[in-house]
């Protein structure tokens, strides 16, 4: 008899990652000093957590085990993860729960708007789990969330970090029509690593998704990111930059992959701060308006400040 246990001590009855339970443990090298972060203990962190709980919301900060949660929540910055806490994909790098999700909460867009208002966010980031079980991948729900935030917080700028909507015709168009200020879709890794890291996705589909946003509405900023430390080569990272620029992506993020549990993909290497700095320099020479590359860079880390820089960079080009 096989005993199924929750590898994150969630519950012995329902594994958080059932597809990973019987995998052998993978070993990652010890974290270097530049990766260490402080435990979250501040009053601002507690206030943000309370607002999230009061509105019954899920955040990617918690679900994905983001190392920056203490810093961001202390400043009352949170990234809302909508459409539930269970993803229909099973990416090898991700700590979000996998399985069959619950039905959508029709009141969620209003709850997100209310939390955005209570936190006083000048810039809000909304992401989601993949919902391959829905005909439109949840696109209408994301669009409704954008509209709800606009109605409640008209001066707040909105960034969405979306799934790939693979085989979901018309889904992307619904979100673009809702006019987020930033459309983010992460490539996550280089093409050669997709089969082992992101097997449910298709690299060139994701590139085309980003390109299509610009074709529909060139005024929307586009953004994408990758993790390093998954076994990629430097020349592959540079090729991803070129592919993104061919799709007119404005903003690139590059961060260090950190292994959530021993059942997830191992960290193959830790990229040094100097290497990240070099990636950033090269990316700017390729034409990105904004680049964030560092060991702890994540898609929504410093998103508000980075949006202001992104807008200023485009305004400068228009002069």
UniProtKB/Swiss-Prot annotation:
Its cofactor is [4Fe-4S] cluster. It is an enzyme of class 2 (transferase). The keyword Membrane does not apply. GO terms for cellular component: cytoplasm. Pathway: Protein modification; protein lipoylation via endogenous pathway; protein N(6)-(lipoyl)lysine from octanoyl-[acyl-carrier-protein]: step 2/2. It is found in: Cytoplasm. [4Fe-4S] cluster 1 binds at residues 61, 66, 72, 300. Signal peptide: none annotated. It catalyses: [[Fe-S] cluster scaffold protein carrying a second [4Fe-4S](2+) cluster] + N(6)-octanoyl-L-lysyl-[protein] + 2 oxidized [2Fe-2S]-[ferredoxin] + 2 S-adenosyl-L-methionine + 4 H(+) = [[Fe-S] cluster scaffold protein] + N(6)-[(R)-dihydrolipoyl]-L-lysyl-[protein] + 4 Fe(3+) + 2 hydrogen sulfide + 2 5'-deoxyadenosine + 2 L-methionine + 2 reduced [2Fe-2S]-[ferredoxin]. GO terms for molecular function: 4 iron, 4 sulfur cluster binding; lipoate synthase activity; metal ion binding. PANTHER family: LIPOYL SYNTHASE, LIPOYL SYNTHASE, MITOCHONDRIAL. Belongs to the radical SAM superfamily. Lipoyl synthase family. HAMAP family: Lipoyl_synth. This is Lipoyl synthase.
């Amino acid at each position: 008899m096989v005993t199924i246990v929750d590898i994150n001590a969630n519950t012995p009855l329902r594994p958080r990652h059932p597809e990973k339970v019987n995998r052998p443990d993978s070993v990652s090298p010890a974290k270097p000093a530049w990766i260490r972060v402080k435990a979250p203990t501040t009053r601002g962190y507690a206030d943000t957590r309370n607002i999230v709980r009061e509105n019954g919301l899920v955040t990617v900060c918690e679900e994905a085990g983001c190392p920056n949660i203490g810093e961001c929540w202390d400043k009352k910055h949170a990234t809302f993860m909508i459409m539930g806490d269970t993803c229909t994909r099973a990416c090898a790098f991700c700590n979000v729960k996998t399985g069959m999700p619950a039905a959508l909460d029709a009141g969620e867009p209003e709850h997100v708007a209310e939390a955005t208002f209570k936190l006083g966010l000048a810039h809000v980031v909304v992401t989601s789990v993949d919902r391959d079980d829905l005909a439109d991948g949840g696109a209408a729900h994301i669009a409704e969330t954008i509209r709800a935030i606009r109605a409640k917080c008209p001066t707040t700028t909105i960034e969405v970090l979306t799934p790939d909507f693979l085989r979901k015709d018309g889904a992307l168009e619904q979100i673009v029509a809702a006019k987020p200020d930033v459309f983010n879709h992460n490539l996550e890794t280089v093409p050669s690593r997709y089969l082992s890291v992101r097997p449910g996705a298709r690299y060139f589909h994701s590139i085309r998704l980003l390109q299509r946003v610009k074709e529909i509405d060139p005024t929307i900023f586009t953004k994408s990111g990758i993790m390093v430390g998954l076994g990629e080569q430097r020349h592959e990272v540079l090729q991803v930059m070129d592919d993104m620029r061919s799709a007119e992506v404005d903003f690139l993020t590059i961060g260090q992959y950190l292994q959530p549990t021993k059942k997830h993909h191992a960290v193959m290497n830790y990229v040094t701060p100097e290497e990240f700095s070099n990636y950033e320099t090269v990316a700017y020479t390729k034409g990105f308006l904004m680049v964030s590359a560092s060991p702890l860079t994540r898609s929504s880390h410093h998103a508000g400040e980075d949006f202001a820089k992104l807008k200023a960079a485009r305004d400068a080009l228009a002069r």
